[in-house]
């Protein structure tokens, strides 16, 4: 879970269409890993139509903003960006040129026509379930329409999205995201996901394996399976029956070239025996698990409709660590949910101490329009939220630094991902997701090398290569 913004690198081949030099697209991505994946798939779809990616909106013919709706100020962040683009569009029009502006993602799904009302300079609004219709929607825009595509599609969008070209995948790196599940049926009272991403939908094993094999053939070594509630994945298996995520992981581990597997984000209620067995038996499944709990108070967990108690979460963590003692945990926390008392917050602090997280995200509660939480009374004062968040983040930061320090002296395998900032350096990824910096000018990106951790940096590890 993150509020980071990224942009899609200009990785699309230019020789595939006679129009390739005349249409350029800039994609700005806000929010989670699934939005990054979605932006890549939209870029792949546009590449098939002759669009070339650019790393700046200044020379783009099409600007797509792929939005996130998790945080309170997500919409205002969007409209601020659209205000800047309006000036750019007006300047283009004064020179007799065009700029097409599109809004995608969860804000697009949530607000739809309202975006066109507030920002008339927008030409296209498209929700996550209709990205396969993007080329057709743009054709309608070129015909003079203002297009809003936010209906939930009957057809399977993944069946209609073009596969990425091998060269494009190579340029994206040796680690890749692969969406296997979308939507959520849990309806936590604070969360907009069921309303913006819809009910849970699982891709078939056939689809997932085909995409994973294409990624492996293009040099991908590490796959992270994505879903709003990824461990609720239950797709049609190769034998015709319904599989769970544990079975899927065992199948993906058989693909040549795939050396590492991860998945995110999970719900405690959906950690079943098969998935725990995968953590025990699969060497490719990395010992790092993002398992949000949100609160350590049973009373608040019930108000959030989390469907589990704090002690059930702790027992689950114990089960996982019993089969994988080196497992590191990350989580999400919300402070200041309506009705949260001092004791409720202290229960959260105690749970954090009991789990001892390697990393966690924490936020002040902000009501999201249309969710049950927005209708709750007994709101916590902002000053109290601020104080609680500060205390929680101090504890989580101390745990994070202690976890990093515990790596010093340890030997581990590291997947090399890119050259470092300094000459002769490489940057890799540890099994626990931490970046690892190594003085190494002999190995290549995609190699897995054995190292010893000698010190820590800011959110990174420093290592020496072992013979």
Curated annotation (Swiss-Prot):
Localization: Cytoplasm
Residue positions binding [4Fe-4S] cluster 1: 32, 68, 106
Name of the protein in its database record: tRNA-2-methylthio-N(6)-dimethylallyladenosine synthase
NCBIfam families associated with the record: miaB-methiolase (TIGR01574), MiaB/RimO family radical SAM methylthiotransferase (TIGR00089)
Domain Radical SAM core: 170-402
Described function: Catalyzes the methylthiolation of N6-(dimethylallyl)adenosine (i(6)A), leading to the formation of 2-methylthio-N6-(dimethylallyl)adenosine (ms(2)i(6)A) at position 37 in tRNAs that read codons beginning with uridine.
This protein's UniProt keywords: 4Fe-4S, Cytoplasm, Iron, Iron-sulfur, Metal-binding, S-adenosyl-L-methionine, Transferase, tRNA processing
CDD domains: Radical_SAM
Similarity-based family: Belongs to the methylthiotransferase family. MiaB subfamily.
Cofactor: [4Fe-4S] cluster
Region (Disordered): 1-20
Residues annotated as domain MTTase N-terminal: 23-143
Residues the record lists as binding [4Fe-4S] cluster 2: 184, 188, 191
Assembly description: Monomer.
Chief site of localization: cytoplasm
Pfam families (UniProt xref): Radical_SAM, TRAM, UPF0004
EC number annotated for this UniProt entry: 2.8.4.3
GO molecular function: 4 iron, 4 sulfur cluster binding; metal ion binding; N6-isopentenyladenosine methylthiotransferase activity
Parts of the chain that traverse the membrane: none
All residue ranges annotated as the TRAM domain in the record: 405-467
Catalysed transformations (reactions): N(6)-dimethylallyladenosine(37) in tRNA + (sulfur carrier)-SH + AH2 + 2 S-adenosyl-L-methionine = 2-methylsulfanyl-N(6)-dimethylallyladenosine(37) in tRNA + (sulfur carrier)-H + 5'-deoxyadenosine + L-methionine + A + S-adenosyl-L-homocysteine + 2 H(+)
GO cellular component annotations of the record: cytosol
